[in-house]
């Protein structure tokens, strides 16, 4: 490797949150880093091994799952809420896609229940009549350009 850099990625619950092939997002990150001469070391936190060490984490990745799996993961993450919140508030990078982002909000409402989120983001999600799938473009006063 050209410059001996390493990036530590923690993939949270890939065994439960992989509804739309989110392992592919990790593979894509690894490849794009490789092209830049950066090794990506991926650690996982799974339903059978709940250990998370954020001390050396450069990126935390959370994918999406069905309501059932997201509810399981949310209950597990709530036990680590302070640790994850401190990580983010101290400049840690957390990438959440699909339903994974709803876990970061105050709550998300499913067809049957209201699930408490981590409250890291000041958002909430209400289930609609139809499932929305596709790309999102955001604009915010915090950023000078659109976020895709």
What does each of the following model-derived ranges do?
Residues 4-7, 142-147:
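Beta-strand-turn-beta hairpins that frame and shape the catalytic cleft
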Residues 20-21, 27, 132-136, 148:
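A broadly tuned "polar low-complexity/structure-edge" signature
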Residues 1-86:
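N-terminal beta1-alpha1 cap of cysteine-dependent amidohydrolase-like domains
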Residues 67-144:
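Cysteine-nucleophile active-site neighborhood
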């Amino acid at each position: 490797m050209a410059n001996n850099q390493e990036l530590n990625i923690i993939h949270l619950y890939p065994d439960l949150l992989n509804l739309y092939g989110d392992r592919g997002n990790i593979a894509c990150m690894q490849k794009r880093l490789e092209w830049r001469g950066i090794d990506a070391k991926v650690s996982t936190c799974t339903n059978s091994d709940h250990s998370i060490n954020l001390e050396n984490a450069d990126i935390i990745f959370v994918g999406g799952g069905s309501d059932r799996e997201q509810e399981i993961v949310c209950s597990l993450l709530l036990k680590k809420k302070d640790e994850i919140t401190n990580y983010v508030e101290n400049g840690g990078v957390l990438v959440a896609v699909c339903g994974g982002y709803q876990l970061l909000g105050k709550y998300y409402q499913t067809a049957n229940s209201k699930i408490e989120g981590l409250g890291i983001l000041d958002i909430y999600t209400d289930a609609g009549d139809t499932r929305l799938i596709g790309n999102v473009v955001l604009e915010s006063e915090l950023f000078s350009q659109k976020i895709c």
